[in-house]
Amino acid sequence: MDPSRYGRQQEWDNNSAPEGYGTQHDPNHRFGVSYDDGYPDERLMRDDVYNYPPGHNTLGDLPQSRKRNYEENYPSELRRQEKPYIDSNYAADYYHDSEAGSRNGHYRDHEHERSSRYDGCDDYSCNDNNYRSKNYHHSRDDGREKDYDYTRRSYDSEYERASVRDGSRKSRDPQDRERNSRDREWDSRDREWDKRCYSRERDESPHKRYEKSRSRSTGRGEFSRSRSPRGRSHGRSYREDSYEGDHWNESERRREYEDRHNQDHFSATPSATVVVKGLSMKSTEEDLYQILAEWGPLHHVRVIREQNSGISRGFAFIDFPTVDAARTMMDRIEHDGIVLDGRKLMFHYSQPTGRAGVSRRQEHASRRSYGGSRNMIVPTDWICTICGCINFARRTSCFQCNEPKTKDSPSADVGLSNSAAGKRISETGPTHVLVVRGLDEDADEEMLRYEFSKHAPIKDLRLVRDKFTHVSRGFAFVHFYSVEDATKALEATNRTALERNGKILRVAYAKSVHGSGTGISAPSHSNNLAAAAIEAATFSQQYDGVGWAPKEYNTGEKQNTGGQAQGVGEIESQKGTSAPQSGYVWDEASGYYYDAASGYYYDGNSGLYYDSNSGLWYSYDQQTQQYVPCPDQNNESKVTENQPDSAKKEKSSQQKVIISAATTPNVEKVLSLPDAVQAAAAAAIASEKREKERVKEIKLASKTSLLASKKKMSNVLTMWKQRSHETQIQRPSPSLGDNPPTVSAEARSSFSTGQSMGKLKSDVIIAKERSTSNHGVSALTTAESSSSSTTGGTLMGVMRGSFGGTLGGASSSASVQMPPILPSASPASVSVSGSGRRRFSETPTAGPTHREQPQTSYRDRAAERRNLYGSSTSSGNDVIDSSEDLMGLRKGSSDPTPFPPGVGGRGITTSTEVSSFDVITEERAIDESNVGNRMLRNMGWHEGSGLGKDGSGMKEPVQAQGVDRRAGLGSQQKKVDAEFEVQPGDTYRTLLHKKALARFRDMSDNN
């Protein structure tokens, strides 16, 4: 230490520093904590820059007894670094508030703080006297050691800087290491004590913690930090780099949160409804009834659960009979607390939401996202003034019309659009609709109507139910005729219990969904609701093809222009008349006044009311206040029928407009806005279903007609192909004569009539046409039966083949009666039927018509091979083989006119057919006409020479050999040699070796 720069310190009596000792070295302006190992900033001057006058002791020195004990316990050398340290439990408060005071520029008198520290009469020490008495000496010793460590580094900084520049840093001595270990030990003790203190504060009641936080905030305001920049830098580095700084900041944030929570808790307005939080998943309403039974009977306890799973969400609402009962319970559990299922419950009064339709959680989340201020206005969705579209709060321009947001753009939130500061629901003004909350699941409309009709007549009442379970959702809307009636009912029913189940009703004015910013202008609130109902009803009926019928105007209006002008004038005059009641609004579509609640149309000229359900006109009786039906409405139609045409025309010219309103299922049911919207959605869904069904029917009809037309065309083509085949391919026979049989015009007409039937016709028409077709076919067969038997057989085969597909496919009962074909038919029919079964060895018949028809159908080669080479199973069963050939040819062959089963000589086989086929031998199979032979010849090969470049290859063609060892079921394998057979003692390796040798031996033998 430089004695010329730092003089000898004074004793504790005067507690003053010499004039050369700057404020940056004053121990009273440094924190009593362990600083980091950094050194003072070399860029700062170490001269006496801040010349502040020394502090004065305003409250006097310590008592002599305290001073004597202090001098005996501590050496005089260390007393000059001593400063009043606060206990570690409140170090965070000290750092936090002293920093805030330094930023604001308020520096306090530290000598006053020191004297008040040891005076023992301040509020701070009195509130926590027990704790200070236990930890007084520890905190002082801890602060002395920590401050001495920092002071030593500050005083020896010149020497240490020189050592660093020379490159030889001086190591710490054992005393320094011992001092650091002792500091760490005290720090760990302080942290443990802080944890115990925090757990003790959590066990205390909220009111005590609130009072203690107030006293603590008063005490901590007496401390401040140093004004020197050097001391300030060290304090900041400690808070940012050390573990203790993070711990203090975290505890400070936790304490501030508890203070705000306690302030909100105690500042909440007491109410008869209490919210319980902290419930377990298995806690039920019965458990809450039991633990709260000592505070009297409870009106209702409801545990909030998930809508889908039914699991408890962890909180519940408890309704007390009165506010005093709820306050008594809250005061009692404030000190004792309640534990249920091993969890401590938290109670607080139920508070209403801040805005209409916005929950408290959403409000807090929005406020946190925009800075967290309690008094700030959270941005809300806004409505475009150009197109009336609702935009999100973050948008600066409308997403529909791209117009920028202006200051005049109204808020989409009704509660905020009416007031700039976001008023409560009750501050927006009364309405004639009340919302009733606090209902249970068993509530119904009759109960509410009985309760509210005592005070004022009810115009409409709607209990909101779940759309899937139809269970009450806990609230309802009551519509009165006037605001005065609604106000009267509100004052009489709010916070009252129902007579049936004792539920406490929470009644308030309802908010209209159509506020000032929605673009709907109407003279009153009821007109807004009625206009919305008409709009919803119009929307629903435009998709309903049954409900809203088009208006019918008289035919003379289109021809008579004057009549048109007169009708328009009547409508304008009717529109100019005033509405009979407040619920009626002008409907441009019908030309009448319409009441959405009753469903009546009002004619301003005649003063009559039209019921859209019954189609009758009524007059309103003011005395009885009832609707009286007009007389002679049913007889009007009969009289009109008996009148002559001139009278009918005259009456039709006098009629104005005939409307057909939407029918409602129940006359007594009142049509409200939500009902109209729901009806619109249902009508839209129904119309969509009908449209889908109509499209499906159209597709099915088109598909059916397409199939019918394809089938018709195929049958017609088959008939004409058969006719052409009969005239070109049929061989002449002595029994047939020169002229082949042809189909008559009557047969063709009956055939066309039979084939033109489709599935789209009705059953009656189909039956008639079937009978006509059958009659035509029978007449045809009768007319042709007089000719030769050969001609009749051929023609019957043609007709049966033509009519069998259509008539048999249409109905199994409709069949054509044909005489059976006997085996004794003439050979001509056999030749005709056999002419279509041409084998692959036959040369095709030369004919221009036949060449033009390509062979695209399936060819049964297996049947051809069986007929050519024979089969072991076909001997003695020629009838079956013949029928198989006919079936294969019926599916498709080179013959364009295949015969159906049983027609054209079925079961008749001759030996001439089999002998007409040419047997292909091995010599003929590979001859000059072979494709491979021709390819080799084109490449220069000739018979007798070998293959390859020099002709040394094979000369004979490869003969294919069939392998019958494993060809099909029942085949016997070649017997293996005895040396390759598997013996009982052979291993797997030996087995593989034997199989490989046997396979090699077999291949060698085959080659």
From Swiss-Prot:
<feature type="compositionally biased region" description="Basic and acidic residues">
    <location>
        <begin position="204"/>
        <end position="214"/>
    </location>
</feature>
<feature type="compositionally biased region" description="Basic and acidic residues">
    <location>
        <begin position="40"/>
        <end position="49"/>
    </location>
</feature>
<feature type="compositionally biased region" description="Basic and acidic residues">
    <location>
        <begin position="138"/>
        <end position="185"/>
    </location>
</feature>
<feature type="region of interest" description="Disordered">
    <location>
        <begin position="810"/>
        <end position="910"/>
    </location>
</feature>
<comment type="function">
    <text>Splicing factor that controls alternative splicing of the developmental regulator ABI3. Reduces splicing of a cryptic intron in ABI3, leading to a decreased in ABI3-beta transcript. Regulates the splicing of the receptor-like kinase SNC4/LRKL-2.6.</text>
</comment>
<dbReference type="InterPro" id="IPR035623">
    <property type="entry name" value="SUA-like_OCRE"/>
</dbReference>
<dbReference type="GO" id="GO:0000398">
    <property type="term" value="P:mRNA splicing, via spliceosome"/>
</dbReference>
<dbReference type="InterPro" id="IPR001876">
    <property type="entry name" value="Znf_RanBP2"/>
</dbReference>
<dbReference type="GO" id="GO:0043484">
    <property type="term" value="P:regulation of RNA splicing"/>
</dbReference>
<feature type="domain" description="RRM 1">
    <location>
        <begin position="272"/>
        <end position="352"/>
    </location>
</feature>
<feature type="compositionally biased region" description="Low complexity">
    <location>
        <begin position="823"/>
        <end position="835"/>
    </location>
</feature>
<dbReference type="InterPro" id="IPR000467">
    <property type="entry name" value="G_patch_dom"/>
</dbReference>
<feature type="compositionally biased region" description="Basic and acidic residues">
    <location>
        <begin position="94"/>
        <end position="120"/>
    </location>
</feature>
<keyword id="KW-0508">mRNA splicing</keyword>
<dbReference type="GO" id="GO:0003723">
    <property type="term" value="F:RNA binding"/>
</dbReference>
<dbReference type="InterPro" id="IPR000504">
    <property type="entry name" value="RRM_dom"/>
</dbReference>
<dbReference type="InterPro" id="IPR035979">
    <property type="entry name" value="RBD_domain_sf"/>
</dbReference>
<feature type="domain" description="RRM 2">
    <location>
        <begin position="432"/>
        <end position="512"/>
    </location>
</feature>
<dbReference type="Pfam" id="PF00076">
    <property type="entry name" value="RRM_1"/>
</dbReference>
<dbReference type="Pfam" id="PF17780">
    <property type="entry name" value="OCRE"/>
</dbReference>
<keyword id="KW-0694">RNA-binding</keyword>
<feature type="region of interest" description="Disordered">
    <location>
        <begin position="204"/>
        <end position="269"/>
    </location>
</feature>
<feature type="region of interest" description="Disordered">
    <location>
        <begin position="725"/>
        <end position="755"/>
    </location>
</feature>
<dbReference type="GO" id="GO:0006397">
    <property type="term" value="P:mRNA processing"/>
</dbReference>
<feature type="region of interest" description="Disordered">
    <location>
        <begin position="771"/>
        <end position="797"/>
    </location>
</feature>
<feature type="compositionally biased region" description="Low complexity">
    <location>
        <begin position="778"/>
        <end position="793"/>
    </location>
</feature>
<feature type="compositionally biased region" description="Basic and acidic residues">
    <location>
        <begin position="237"/>
        <end position="264"/>
    </location>
</feature>
<keyword id="KW-0747">Spliceosome</keyword>
<protein>
    <recommendedName>
        <fullName>SUPPRESSOR OF ABI3-5</fullName>
    </recommendedName>
</protein>
<feature type="zinc finger region" description="RanBP2-type">
    <location>
        <begin position="378"/>
        <end position="407"/>
    </location>
</feature>
<keyword id="KW-0863">Zinc-finger</keyword>
<keyword id="KW-0539">Nucleus</keyword>
<comment type="subunit">
    <text>Interacts with the pre-spliceosomal component U2AF65A.</text>
</comment>
<feature type="compositionally biased region" description="Basic and acidic residues">
    <location>
        <begin position="849"/>
        <end position="867"/>
    </location>
</feature>
<dbReference type="InterPro" id="IPR041591">
    <property type="entry name" value="OCRE"/>
</dbReference>
<dbReference type="GO" id="GO:0008270">
    <property type="term" value="F:zinc ion binding"/>
</dbReference>
<feature type="domain" description="G-patch">
    <location>
        <begin position="928"/>
        <end position="974"/>
    </location>
</feature>
<dbReference type="InterPro" id="IPR012677">
    <property type="entry name" value="Nucleotide-bd_a/b_plait_sf"/>
</dbReference>
<keyword id="KW-0479">Metal-binding</keyword>
<feature type="region of interest" description="Disordered">
    <location>
        <begin position="1"/>
        <end position="185"/>
    </location>
</feature>
<dbReference type="GO" id="GO:0005634">
    <property type="term" value="C:nucleus"/>
</dbReference>
<feature type="region of interest" description="Disordered">
    <location>
        <begin position="631"/>
        <end position="656"/>
    </location>
</feature>
